[in-house]
Every structure is written in structure tokens, then in C-alpha cells.
Amino acid sequence: MIFCVVVVGVPLVWAIYLSLTDASGGSLSGHFIGFQNFTDAWHDQNFRNALENTVIITFASQAIVVVGAAILSHHLVRDFRGKWFVRLLVILPWAAPVALVTIVWLWILDSLLSVLSWTLGKMHLLGAVCGAFGVHGCSAANPPPWLGHPKLAMFSIIVVQAWRILPFAVIIFIAGRASIPSEVDDAARIDGATALKKLWYVDLPLQLPIALVAVLFGIVFTAVDFAVVYLLTHGGPFNSTQVLPTWAYAVGIDSGSLGAGAAISLFLFPLLVLVTILMLFFARRAQVS
């Protein structure tokens, strides 16, 4: 209890205090200005872009995560040779430090030495993928700037975020599948249900509550993430990939406006609380006994 108060409570209260003042760099106090920082942030176009990017990246990545976790868990619960090794490979992105794996992605998405560009080029898909984002003329000799073009940079961040959260969701889905009584599977097979029908009419409805839990954690982890966007693009190019955590850092730390930065960071708090309440509500409604 004391640990939670010190680690969570004190910083939160201090951030709320700073958001109501005009505190700047070099000082942890300032004059009380009420909700002026929140009003200024809301009318700032850069803030609105960061908020929009946060929502897009969060929900787009979670859509990929849910589909990927459902497919992977469906196969990983079966018995096959090397099952433990495949599970190890799946969980590695979650176990590795975020900064480390993001630096690896920097190499994968490098504008000159990109292994992704090389792979897509060998598959003759590079031009089609780039064209889907309005970038034309891409080839092995002219690789795309994955992190230098606004649309490609957003797409890259969504993929990295989904890849990072996917292992956690897979673990939750596997646990959910393990909780399904064997009698249910036996009854479905006796009724002649195909694998696809069993997945759609039996497995997914029974896993819905735990899937909502996975989505909830994924939304929270992605929305508050700072490292991926900061290390990949620093919010660029031209602030096109700024999210609320990186924009709060840019305003509060880089620009020295501690009060304004604290206000920006606190915008996420009520949104995440609302998402949590809604997800738990629907999880309870969808629970199957």
C-alpha cells in the first residue's frame, strides 16, 4: 500500500498540482492559473493531432493484436513438435526491453539498409505496399523512407506497437482457451461442427470476456507508451506521429513548460479510466458461465 502511494499517488498528485500552475523549467512550483493549461492545450492544433494519433495508433494496433492473438492461440494450444520453442519465440517480444526491441526495429525500418524493404522487394511487393500509402517509385534501388514519410511512419508505429503487445494477448487467449471445458469441445465435435464453425460459434463467444481483458490492457499499454514513438520518429516527420506522451515530453521537458506538459499528460487519465470502466462493464455483460 505504501509502495503504491509513493510510486503512483505522489507523482499523480504532483502532476495535477503542476498542471494548475505556470511552473517552468528550473522550478517545481508556480503561480496558480486554474485550468488555463488545459484550455490552451485543447486549442493547440499540435495537441489535437497528438490526441488523434494516440487514438488511431492505439485502436489500429489493438485490432491487429486481437486478430493475431486469436489465430496464434488457436494453433498454439494444439500439440505439435517444437511447441515449447514456438511459444518461446512468440513471448520474446514481450519479455525483451522495449528500448532494445525498438532499436532493432530502427534497423529493420532503416531508409537505406532496411531488411523489410529487401524482403518486400524479393517478394515483388515493395511497390504495391508503398503505393497503398501514396508513395510511388519504390524499388530495391530506391527504398522507401519508412520513418521519414508521415503515412509510412504511422503505419510503422502501428505495426511495432501491435508486435510488442501481441505476445501478452496470446498468453491471455491461451489461458482463456484452456479454461473452456473439454465437454464443450466434445459436444461440438459430436454435433459435426467444422473447425471454423467451432472457432466462430464456440471458442470466440466463450473467450469474449478474456478477449476484452486483453484489449483493455493493450489499450492502456499502447496509449501511455512513450518509448516506441520517441525512439522511432521523435514524433516526426514534422510532428506527424506525435502522441500525447511524446508531446507532453516535448512541451514539458524540451520546452521547459512543466505546467503545460503536466496538463497534456493528464488528458489521458480520464480517457483511460472511462475505457477501463466500459471494458469491465462489457466483460461482465459478456461473461458466459
Report residues per predicted region.
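A structural signal for multi-pass alpha-helical bundles of membrane permease subunits
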Residues: 1-289
